[in-house]
């Protein structure tokens, strides 16, 4: 079983330089790992068994299995209630009149592993875009400043390069920050879109699936219909048509066991709650981002919290001189640079910025 999940190990690698935030990582790391693991779990027939087993008189089992796998199986919604073994064979499996009674086909069954993998790709797209747009800028600026044991000569040289870059490119980082904000918005749009996509995939059953499962546990046994048995039945029906000896069409009703649905029902209960939590956190993250863009005072407080070792006057001066793009880059640097070195960077930036301010005041008199 552990060999099956070997391909997921690469996603567990911790990046040396952080270019995003925790909510962002929940999308492209946690969610992608979860979806790929689920996809591999469903795909691993050798560990779980045959995906479908059908029985019907006079039809070879292999033929029936293949036919029902291709054309999908169905249940009868009117037969979801009743005593198993007396009124119905299993919930949703009972006698019906073809063409009159409503039947529900479960066409999703053979596509679950592919859809889960496709969802994992979609969750990685914003990360891929941001990594391409970011272009390794933070990594180049951090260099070895994330190590507390770097020697003084090397530290001073690289710190000077960083400060010179920042002063020389002041007010030129808005587009850099804007592209990250776009990727954050894409994360939110993606997770909301995924909820609707899975709802469409499961024929409108996903949007209320988790809440229905919770309600099911609170109802009396004789009053409840198991939503997991409705959406992911373990036993279904399959109708096979063939020509008889006289050339007439014969109809054969078969029972099919869908063993993977015992896994699928748990997977989608988990995904329902995970997507809800992820969408709420992503929404809060967007509100936070809007507040950061619109509030210079909030940016000052956040930078102060990030550089607690620096003097408050120096932090205030730097925050006031930075626009949103400069602030964002400086804040991201604070996540990756050693706190003591970051304090010195803030101090050097403050000194350079105050020096530029004094020079600007002196120029009219010098002229």
Swiss-Prot record:
Residues 130-179 are annotated as: Interaction with shg. InterPro entries: Innexin (IPR000990). Residues 44-109, 201-266 are extracellular. It is a multi-pass membrane protein. Induction: Expression in embryos at ectoderm/endoderm boundaries during gut organogenesis is induced by activation of the wg signaling cascade. GO terms for biological process: cell communication; foregut morphogenesis; germarium-derived egg chamber formation; germarium-derived female germ-line cyst formation; intercellular transport; male germ-line stem cell population maintenance; monoatomic ion transmembrane transport; morphogenesis of embryonic epithelium. Monomer and heterooligomer with ogre or Inx3 (via cytoplasmic C-terminal region). Interacts (via cytoplasmic loop) with shg (via cytoplasmic region). Interacts with arm. Structural components of the gap junctions. Involved in gap junctional communication between germline and somatic cells which is essential for normal oogenesis. In embryonic epidermis, required for epithelial morphogenesis. Required for keyhole formation during early stages of proventriculus development in response to wg signaling. In follicle cells, promotes the formation of egg chambers in part through regulation of shg and baz at the boundary between germ cells and follicle cells. In inner germarial sheath cells, required for survival of early germ cells and for cyst formation. This is Innexin inx2. It comes from Drosophila melanogaster (Fruit fly). The lineage of its organism: Eukaryota, Metazoa, Ecdysozoa, Arthropoda, Hexapoda. The gene is Inx2.
